């Protein structure tokens, strides 16, 4: 099983299952979750230098253009973000703008698909 597959499977866990996984790993390897987080942050910085997009876990969904159907794009942006009509319109009119920040790959792809389905230009960063 590759690391990427393992990460995807872990991402599918519920919060309760993830908590149980952390406890099981702590017991199995005799470690604490707090130092593991610090180590994860420290090791994430050098990985940024290497061109390895497969390891990226958080994405920003950027609206690059409204396309032909601006009204439908505004409706989708409102549904995705919870913004009011004016705020959603300003976001769409000001493209390129970030619609959602730091979302999982699956969620980012879902959001991008919804926006593309109504004719918007979308980019994942």
Swiss-Prot record:
Pfam families: Ribosomal_L12, Ribosomal_L12_N. InterPro entries: Ribosomal_bL12 (IPR000206), Ribosomal_bL12_C (IPR013823), Ribosomal_bL12_C/ClpS-like (IPR014719), Ribosomal_bL12_oligo (IPR008932), Ribosomal_bL12_oligo_N_sf (IPR036235). One of its GO terms (molecular function) is mRNA binding. GO terms for cellular component: cytosolic large ribosomal subunit. The keyword Signal does not apply. Disulfide bonds: none annotated. GO terms for biological process: translation. Forms part of the ribosomal stalk which helps the ribosome interact with GTP-bound translation factors. Is thus essential for accurate translation. Belongs to the bacterial ribosomal protein bL12 family. This is Large ribosomal subunit protein bL12. The gene is rplL.
